[in-house]
Amino acid sequence: DQASISQNDINYINAHGTSTPLNDKFETMAMKSVFGNQAYKIPINSTKSMIGHLLGASGAIEAAVTALSIKNSMIHPTANLESPDPECDLDYTSGHSKELDINYAMSNSFGFGGHNTSLIFKKYE
């Protein structure tokens, strides 16, 4: 609401993606709840799969990666994603980078104790 865009405008998500069974399952459920059927059409990746969990610094690094993904029209793969949990059935990018013209992107950061944030980025015009 505060971003003045529709959830249908988001066309890339940098997930919190800790590669833990509960987190990935619940993050997938949350994306389905927010985006409905559109969730299945949004490319998603996890930066943590490549750099690990940097705790308090994770959100800043992932925000920078999201901004660079918009600038370069490219998203990195989720490293080591070979057989996702059946409940994690969205468009998780794996294997190789994907070219993508990104207009709006979302970067999720979820912390211990319920400190949760989703940042929305827009392509500079």
Regions from the PLM with identified roles:
Residues 1-125:
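Conserved "HGTGT" condensation-loop signature of ketosynthase/thiolase-family condensing enzymes
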